[in-house]
């Protein structure tokens, strides 16, 4: 099972990815985690990434795809994976398609968690208020200013990825505003259809 989960920050992608990993024995591939691991391991692609990051630059799509290619060859990724934080642009989606094709693979599903962004902002504000009321630290991502900045970046840069997959007939949309268990059940339904 090879999946991409799409949706804005706060839509519940991380929660659903954790549930999919636990139920299906697949791995969650976070580009940020993979980048750090490749740098730490000193792989050829990791060394390229380190040079760029040390110079204060953004890691290119080519390097990120190289890191994903290395990671897909790992034994634990053979049963499948969920991509988290990738692709973020149409160019990355196209590069991912080419990478998978070169390995004789394809995505089984691209699932978008569709949310009402105004209600989503309220959800995040409530989550932050609940954490404060319990005396817990508020997640940096839940700071209203930070969250709105992330949402604007998503709308500007990443929202175009869903139409890319829709045009290819790969996109399945799920109501991300539903209760968590209902979202999980809807994802399971999509995966059953794809199997």
Curated annotation (Swiss-Prot):
Give the superkingdom in one word.
Bacteria
Per UniProt, AMP binds at: 31, 36, 57-59, 85-88, 92, 150
| Coarse class of the protein's main subcellular location | cytoplasm
Among Gene3D superfamilies, the record links this protein to: P-loop containing nucleotide triphosphate hydrolases
Asked whether the keyword Transmembrane is assigned, the reply is: no
* E.C. no: 2.7.4.3
Alphabetic keyword roster: ATP-binding, Cytoplasm, Kinase, Nucleotide biosynthesis, Nucleotide-binding, Transferase
Q: Which reaction does it catalyse?
A: AMP + ATP = 2 ADP
* One GO term of the biological process aspect: AMP salvage
Query: Where does this protein hold ATP?
Result: 10-15, 127, 178
Keyword Metal-binding annotated: no
| GO cellular component, as recorded | cytoplasm
| Associated pathway | Purine metabolism; AMP biosynthesis via salvage pathway; AMP from ADP: step 1/1
Q: Region NMP: what ranges?
A: 30-59
One protein family per Pfam: ADK
Where do the record's region annotations for LID lie?
126-143
GO molecular function (one): adenylate kinase activity
Q: What quaternary structure, including any partners, is listed in this protein's UniProt entry?
A: Monomer.
**What does the function comment of this entry state?**
Catalyzes the reversible transfer of the terminal phosphate group between ATP and AMP. Plays an important role in cellular energy homeostasis and in adenine nucleotide metabolism.
Comment, domains: Consists of three domains, a large central CORE domain and two small peripheral domains, NMPbind and LID, which undergo movements during catalysis. The LID domain closes over the site of phosphoryl transfer upon ATP binding. Assembling and dissambling the active center during each catalytic cycle provides an effective means to prevent ATP hydrolysis.
- Family under the similarity heading: Belongs to the adenylate kinase family.
What HAMAP family does its record include? Answer: Adenylate_kinase_Adk (MF_00235)
> What protein does this entry describe?
Adenylate kinase
Recorded source organism is Xanthobacter autotrophicus (strain ATCC BAA-1158 / Py2)
């Amino acid at each position: 099972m090879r999946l991409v989960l799409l949706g804005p920050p706060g839509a519940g992608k991380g929660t659903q990815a954790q549930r999919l990993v636990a139920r299906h024995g697949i791995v969650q591939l976070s580009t940020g985690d993979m980048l750090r691991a490749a740098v730490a391991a000193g792989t050829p692609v990791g060394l390229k990434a380190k040079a760029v990051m040390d110079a204060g630059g953004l890691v290119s799509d080519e390097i990120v795809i190289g890191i994903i290619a290395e990671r897909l060859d790992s034994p634990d990724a053979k049963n499948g994976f969920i991509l988290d934080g990738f692709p973020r642009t149409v160019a990355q989606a196209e590069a991912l398609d080419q990478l998978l094709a070169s390995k004789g693979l394809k995505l089984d599903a691209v699932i978008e968690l569709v949310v009402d962004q105004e209600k989503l902002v309220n959800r995040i504000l409530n989550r932050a208020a609940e954490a404060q009321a319990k005396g817990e630290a508020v997640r940096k991502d839940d700071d209203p200013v930070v969250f709105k900045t992330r949402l604007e970046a998503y709308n500007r840069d990443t929202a175009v990825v869903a139409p890319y997959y829709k045009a290819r007939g790969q996109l399945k949309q799920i109501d991300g505003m539903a209760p968590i268990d209902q979202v999980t059940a809807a994802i399971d339904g999509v995966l059953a259809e794809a199997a």
